[in-house]
Every structure is written in C-alpha cells, then in structure tokens.
C-alpha cells in the first residue's frame, strides 16, 4: 500500500511538471453599453509542430476545442467562431479531423444584460483543447482566463445588437440526432429525443 501511495505521489508531481505547448491570451477590444453585443477574442499560440482540434465536426477519438463564457452580467452567449481549420487525416487517431496547426483564433460573442450598471467587469473564459504533434497527443486540458470588460452608460447602438446564437439543429445533415445540440437545448428536449 505504501508503494502505491508513493508511486501516485511521484506520478502527480511529474504530471504537474507538464507544461502545455499552448499559450492562451484573450481580450475585448471595445467598451460596451448595457444590452449590447460584445465579443472576446481568444488566441492560442504554439510552435508550428503542434496543433489543436477545431470547435466542431471532429472524427472519432480527438476532443474538439470548446470555448465557454460566464458572468452574471451576460444575458446570452452567441455561436463561437474560429479561423478556418485544416482538414486532414490524423495518424494519432486514424481518422479525418479538423485542426489548427501552429495556432488558432476564436471569437466568442455575448449579449450584456440591459439593466447592467456601468463599471468594470471580468468575463470568465474557459477553453478546453487537446494538443498534439505528429507523435504524441496530450490529454484534454481546460484553462481559464479572466478578461476585463469596461461597461459604459448610454443607449444601445443598433450596430451592436446582432449576434448568431448557439442554436444548433437537433438533427445533423444525415438525419442523426445531434447529441450536443439536444443537451444544450435543455433537459426536456434531451429526454424527449432519447
């Protein structure tokens, strides 16, 4: 039993020494007014040999990247977009995948609540990604960033009201149930479809 505890302890020390080859940064470019749409720009940088998986449409095996936003001042989150991924056969998983080689950029829009007081806020950004190169894939990793947002008073500007929402079709192009969309749409829809 003592050997197992020592082994587990040493393994956890080694695991904590792992430094991801991905460096994340995020920012919000402009000030926003209550009720407006703003967006967080997230950048993942890494050496050219490394890649992360795209947001959607992954093959069997790899973990798609995921960007989530949170904060009590956020009314709704829109559909996260990304720069164009490369489609390629992944030797690590023996399947076709969509990846971002050497880096990626994501834009995560969100709508502020209308009754929000002007002031400084932090948008909590969660990024889940799996990073690989030609010979190794690390387990999926979740990182958090707090991104400052400056909310100023004023009426909602018309050009800052449109946003693609996260609504996905409950069925994919082949007629199969899109499980992620069913779960996102709520418990009742998920139970109904199951």
Put a short name on every predicted segment.
Residues 186-193:
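Residue-level signature of transmembrane alpha-helical entry/exit and packing/kink sites
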